[in-house]
């Protein structure tokens, strides 16, 4: 399909909210042995569980390497899951896949952001990442969607959340990090977001969750529930390093209006743990120069906020933690018309993210 030389805003396209009706969800099969322990086998089982949970509500497409195609097809042998061969460097389709945009006449296109493995050679998590840079184009080609490119502008899908009504939430820790777009000012970054997502108001939270190796992605910390309402990861423990981060985010949200002039209603989601990898879990990850080291003394950035909204369902991680039941109850209260499905998320967390990070929703065409 063709690459367009205009912008979504100029063409009447915008990024819809995650709760908009979806055609399908995309995933990528995990196998990288220097990120996923034991050659990715435990993560593959967890990944399959997520895909099957989503497939109860809508179709899923899982991209997989040629080497793993037969294995993935066998593990994902349910009617609503399609498996396609696609090369990539890892499984984080939220960050490497396209951001889909729609217009009022029923067309869907995609934005292909620049990608540098969360920091390039200044804190990035692996190298090379050239196959990941091609994922967005490949997805759009398969779906016959036209593509917008942001040459020279790096952004991961997990670093933004939108309400579909003109407001975007992000973090300074990530988007203003020197290892993403050091040549651009805050105002210039905002201009790119406005042109490619058709948003008006950009809400900057200072930081994301403590020790999030993506440099504080907002999708692990704060997300929309509906327009004007957000769910914020939260701790009341002043000794928790997340405490000042939560307080600072709440301060911003309580003193900011969205694009429609609304003040935010903030719901709080307890943070699980603290969670740590075991020595055995870390020992199962291949040690490769240039890749993220796994260390049992480093706290994991576990979060129940890292869930996916699908058609009629909420797919959220559980951690075998005392907070699991409370997290499910909070989500069910906030989404009364959705079925909340908790899927074990520890193996995904050990790899550096969770359900939202490993999925990318494709909105359905909408005619207005």
Swiss-Prot record:
GO terms for biological process: putrescine biosynthetic process from arginine. One of its GO terms (molecular function) is agmatine deiminase activity. The keyword Hydrolase applies. The active site is at residue 357. Belongs to the agmatine deiminase family. Homodimer. Its EC number is 3.5.3.12. It catalyses: agmatine + H2O = N-carbamoylputrescine + NH4(+). It is an enzyme of class 3 (hydrolase). Pfam families: PAD_porph. The keyword Hydrolase applies. Pathway: Amine and polyamine biosynthesis; putrescine biosynthesis via agmatine pathway; N-carbamoylputrescine from agmatine: step 1/1. InterPro entries: Agmatine_deiminase (IPR017754), Peptidyl-Arg-deiminase_porph (IPR007466). It comes from Pseudomonas fluorescens (strain ATCC BAA-477 / NRRL B-23932 / Pf-5). Mediates the hydrolysis of agmatine into N-carbamoylputrescine in the arginine decarboxylase (ADC) pathway of putrescine biosynthesis, a basic polyamine. The lineage of its organism: Bacteria, Pseudomonadati, Pseudomonadota, Gammaproteobacteria, Pseudomonadales. It comes from the Bacteria. This is Agmatine deiminase. Keywords: Hydrolase, Polyamine biosynthesis.
